[in-house]
């Protein structure tokens, strides 16, 4: 990213900033490791959505299933060799962006899984969870579906009947879970939180992994101007305060006299050289 002399090159901008999206001040260069992880996330999504496909059944048979069948167990020893081992490594970050949509409820746990919102019910209603019978139960064990599939009823049991002061809390709990159940009968499915339509895409997963800052940057003024790209690049480095002025060279431990090479009136910073120097003002 620039050079001071042919024998030695200074890194002008930190690589993590270069990899930020253009909109927040980077160059939009993808980090290969994170992009590869995002690509592998597509296979985790397919494994959860294509359970009847032969390849899913083979993988599940080899490694075993966990989390209601949405993912496999971690392979160990020689069992963990191969491509799936690397795919499985990204499961924790992947499932952090997944909600579960209840169909029959065979693969979704009432209290632990994210199906009724972004907080599991055990954390949203800790008082009721502490009194619940069978804390690790599947939703299918607690609902009764009418023959036409039009409505469902819950049968959640607690250690004791709620006290008078708890009745309102229990009513709010039931109102909450009823509101999150879709009508009709279907299979349990995944919903990707990072897209509006709930379908996984690589770009949204990559952006979550790279976690760029939410800052304002005049990227349109820099990259949309009708000037040569080298001029745009110079403006970008100036906006990053990364031009190799004497002030920045001193920060890189070079022993120089920090004085403007044009006016000799102040230190040669980016702001002084381009904005406040009397020679710059004359331009």
Regions found by a protein language model. Give the residues of each.
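A helix-boundary/hinge signal
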Residues: 1-283
């Amino acid at each position: 990213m620039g050079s001071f002399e042919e024998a030695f090159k200074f890194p002008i901008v930190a690589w993590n900033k270069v990899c930020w999206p253009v909109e927040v001040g980077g160059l939009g260069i993808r980090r290969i490791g994170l992009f590869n992880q995002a690509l592998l996330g597509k296979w985790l999504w397919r494994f959860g959505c294509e359970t009847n496909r032969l390849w899913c059944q083979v993988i599940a048979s080899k490694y075993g299933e966990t989390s209601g069948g949405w993912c496999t167990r971690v392979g160990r020893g020689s069992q963990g060799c191969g491509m799936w081992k690397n795919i499985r490594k990204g499961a924790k970050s992947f499932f952090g962006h997944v909600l579960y949509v209840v169909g029959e409820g065979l693969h979704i746990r009432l209290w632990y899984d994210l199906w009724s919102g972004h907080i599991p019910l055990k954390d949203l209603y800790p008082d009721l969870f502490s009194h619940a019978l069978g804390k690790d139960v599947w939703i299918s064990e607690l609902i009764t579906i009418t023959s036409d599939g039009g409505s469902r009823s819950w049968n959640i049991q607690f250690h004791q009947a709620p006290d008078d002061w708890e009745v309102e809390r229990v009513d709010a709990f039931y109102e909450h879970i009823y509101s999150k159940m879709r009508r009709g009968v279907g299979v349990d499915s995944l919903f990707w939180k990072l897209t509006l339509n709930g379908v996984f895409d690589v770009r949204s997963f990559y952006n979550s992994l790279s976690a760029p800052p939410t800052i304002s940057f005049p990227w349109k003024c820099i990259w949309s101007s009708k000037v040569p790209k080298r001029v745009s690049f110079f403006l970008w480095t100036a906006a990053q305060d990364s031009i190799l002025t004497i002030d920045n060279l001193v920060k890189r431990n070079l022993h120089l006299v920090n004085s403007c090479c044009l006016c000799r009136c102040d230190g040669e910073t980016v702001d002084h050289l381009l904005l406040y120097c009397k020679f710059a003002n004359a331009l």
